Amino acid sequence: MCIRDRLLTWVNKGYEVITLTASCGLMLKFEWPLLLPNDEEIKKLSKHTKDIDEYIVDIHQKECIASGIQEIDSGVTVHHACHARAQNMGNKARDMLKLIPNIKIDLVERCAGHGGTFGVMKKTHYIAKKVGKLTVTKIAKKNNKYMASDCPLAGKHLQQLEQDTKITNNEAIHPIEILAKAYKLI
């Protein structure tokens, strides 16, 4: 059974497919249907796929999220990754984090330079570092403890650049982890 059919088994039972990374969401929602434009099953899967931040925001708008959310210990710089911006859904990571009481959120909408394997390949790593350097500088100026990116690879790449350049020591995590901190789950 192929991945499409496995995911559709759940979609046909009434579930949504929730992606944890912006690149996976972009692939399932937009790129796969472009690659196979005549496949109705792929179109169906695409319509029932959501980014995890988008999913939480939708739940809150429809039903309100669970009580018990508390302030966190510091501000957050949200890196709005390229693959999230390409989905044209707005900045759902920021919208989700706004659910946390009294949170300070700063936004950086700039390429991290990672680009999937581009950022780790020996031949292109130096370019990835060069592209990401300005983004890291912008993040450092925000002076927040946390840097949350809806693309974990971009977040880790930016964190590595921070360590290489000795700019700052942000903790790079996924926005859903910030929400988990606000619920005292981690």
Model-derived features: where do they sit?
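Iron-sulfur cluster-binding electron-transfer modules in prokaryotic oxidoreductases
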Residues: M1-I186
